[in-house]
Amino acid sequence: MAFTRKRQREQQLQLYSKERFSLLLLNLEEYYFEQHTAFHVQHQGSQEERKIRGSLKICSKSVIFEPDAISQPILKIPLRDCLKIGKHGENGANKHFAKAKSWGISLIFSQIYFIKEHNIVAPYKIERGKMEYVFELEVSGKVEDVVETLLQLHRASCLDKLGDQMAMITAILQSRLARTSFDKNRFQSVSEKLHMECKAEMVTPLVTNPGHVCITDTSLYFQPLNGYPKPVVQITLQDVRRIYKRRHGLMPLGLEVFCTDDDLCSDIYLKFYEPQDRDDLYFYIATYLEHHAAEHTAESYMLQWQRGHLSNYQYLLHLNNLADRSCNDLSQYPVFPWIISDYSSPELDLSNPATFRDLSKPVGALNAERLERLLTRYQEMPEPRFMYGSHYSSPGYVLFYLVRIAPEYMLCLQNGRFDNADRMFNSIAETWKNCLDGATDFKELIPEFYDEDVSFLVNSLKLDLGKRQGGQMVDDVDLPAWASSPQDFLQKNKDALESGYVSEHLHEWIDLIFGYKQKGSEAIGAHNVFHPLTYEGGVDLNSIEDPDEKVAMLTQILEFGQTPKQLFVTPHPRRITPKFKSLSQASSYNASLTDSPVSPGEESFEDLTEESRTLAWSNIAKLQLHEQYKIHKEAVTGIAVSCNGSSVFTTSQDSTLKMFSKESKMLQRSISFSNMALSSCLLLPGDTTVISSSWDNNVYFYSIAFGRRQDTLMGHDDAVSKICWHNDRLYSGSWDSTVKVWSGVPAEMPGTKRHQFDLLAELEHDVSVNTINLNAVSTLLVSGTKEGMVNIWDLTTATLLHQTSCHSGTVCDAAFSPDSRHILSTGVDGCLNVIDVQTGMLISSMASEEPQRCFVWDGNSVLSGSRSGELLVWDLLGAKVSERIQGHTGAVTCMWMNEQCSSIITGGEDRQIMFWKLQY
């Protein structure tokens, strides 16, 4: 569980330091500066004194004394409550302390807190009234320095304005940091080379710890100014798996480092004082990681989730991580949705849609009556307006859920108190009801509700959390009737999260929290508007000159909750079934290199199974060159293969169409239609007609049986770049900025008469069209232009569905995935882009060192042909090149794959065609 794992790490560090003390004993925005071994001098009787040994902690707003004996309470004296501070004997000390030595420190104050007596976590005990405590330092020579420090901090704490207090404390802190530097003796090796050093704070939930960051050629170090909880935190760069820039207080100052694949528990979270320091450190580590770890984007995770390679839970974790949500920052703790809405039935029916919460609405809009009241207030509110006065995620809400495993955090947040017993997390059903009906309660859930650790539901620490109005003590969380145990409750929550209903609708909730409905007019329409201070860019803290206003703003930002960083600005696509059924293409062919017929002697298309295709693609890196032939005088531009696999037809920039026999390994025919280059070719079913497109603006039909040109379609005003065919319709893309749809092109064209080609539709573009392709059933067409635009067209209505500008320069190739859910495009910019067909959203982009001119793909993996002649195998889900295969001596310009995915033919600028076989 997220918080449990985090807490375990902190407890391990506390064991290292052997202290009961933790930074959670400090106030919010307070710093721990130094500690001294000391004795608390207590008066017993008229002459007797008792000395309790311990550690005196000097903090920016308090003095804390931690006795060595755990039976004794920790003492916390707020500096603002101190009446006098000085060396013993200078404060008009109580006569009972007459024997206390001169190196004692005397504090006269009006209020003191007693904490963790017998090491029991409980609300702080408070004693009020004028009193004096004396502490003797073990090193007497430090008394004057400590007293001077306390007096300086006392002056800061007593300033009237919070802004002035913060400014003075910050100046003291920066002065201490400036007088110190990282101890180079802490390097792991004398051979380490220092790269940079700067000041920063280590961030843990609710608290930060200032110190020095140092990075060398092998390690990242953080040395706390106070040496707590250990002298140095060291991370070996070789162990780093991921790093993320973070917002802290809505400012670009954070950096989080992960050395494991755990998306919830990082190894260190640093907050810098200057964005440039953060960026420099990030760049250095990122440069180191380039060859050690793959970087994932929201789009790459989306693709994995869509295709079923990530569970709903895993995907939400990744999105939270990318959106700056961190377990180290309770104002930006990972947020998960309420899924179940039925907490009263004896049995949970996950097949009933009524069991689930409406994921298209924020929590505040689930109750229509409450929403109406909120909207009325919203309309009457002056600008800037907001619908909800509280957020769906805040430190208070997180600790509301986690108080049973994180009581010290709640005490820190609530100034030493637990919340009222009736307002605590007592019941799942009551909490859900309050989220539906409460005037100010709009909270979502946290990852723990979908994990395996039940400890946050059980009072295993036997905490005294108070007594409710009905007389019952707050203990374990009351579960719904359909949950037989905490384990059963979490399991059913997990089952609900991964259910079919949620998989179909989770994208709607993502739109609200991480997506395009988070801000602007879409947020207003979705009733999803929160206080401006919760949004990134809602306020510029650096522009606020009034220190009091600045502190107030920062406090509100940290305590009120923050909206996640926006990851998507267009509608999030739905999830799709990861396993797709093969669609028959017996009547669909085109010059696209992925939709060619199958050779007899191999399995027919109808007999192909998903397993056989999957097996072939899983071994795609095992391609071996079988044969190669140089049959053209210029670059090869298109490939088509006969049904029996014996004849290969190719087009070239040398203006010829050639027919090559695989059996005799000889060139059988060479046909020239004009003196200009041919750009693509396709073979109609029946193997009687080859169609070729040309740069002379025409499309040529060649009869194989009669051995002559049988027709010419003069349909464009500029070069025809690509042709496709399906069910008697021909599709032609051209540099004249159009794609045209023609009827009257039957599968078996008689060679004895000319045809009447009727123009059915003209799909107009703003610039030249370089490539086109059809989806499996030819209801959609994708076109790629010379200015980097990828267009998706609905062929049933001849309308443009989506237009995505995703390349800088010409789109080389574009094709649908076998299930028609995605489009892959390549361009001269070297990028491979994946686009969601439903939304037109760019969901993945990978950069290669050079343009990939052509490709075939199965939706998960890609085989592409590069400008240098290599064949590259890409793992789209892993966003990486998994294999490089040497092929042509020039660019690979076209590619064909049979339906079994076991045979491949490539054509190149080196004028060759190469025959490849899978060996497995």
From Swiss-Prot:
One of its GO terms (molecular function) is death receptor binding. Residues 290-575 form the BEACH domain. The keyword Repeat applies. Residues 176-247 form the GRAM domain. Residues 189-286 form the BEACH-type PH domain. InterPro entries: BEACH_dom, BEACH_dom_sf, BEACH_Domain, GRAM, PH-BEACH_dom, PH-like_dom_sf, WD40/YVTN_repeat-like_dom_sf, WD40_repeat_dom_sf. Keywords: Repeat, WD repeat. WD repeats lie at residues 631-661, 673-703, 715-743, 764-794, 806-836, 887-917. Gene3D superfamilies: BEACH domain, Pleckstrin-homology domain (PH domain)/Phosphotyrosine-binding domain (PTB), YVTN repeat-like/Quinoprotein amine dehydrogenase. CDD domains: Beach (cd06071), PH_BEACH (cd01201), WD40 (cd00200). One of its GO terms (cellular component) is plasma membrane. One of its GO terms (biological process) is regulation of membrane lipid metabolic process. The keyword Metal-binding does not apply. PANTHER family: BEIGE/BEACH-RELATED, PROTEIN FAN. Couples the p55 TNF-receptor (TNF-R55 / TNFR1) to neutral sphingomyelinase (N-SMASE). Specifically binds to the N-smase activation domain of TNF-R55. May regulate ceramide production by N-SMASE. This is Protein FAN. It comes from Mus musculus.
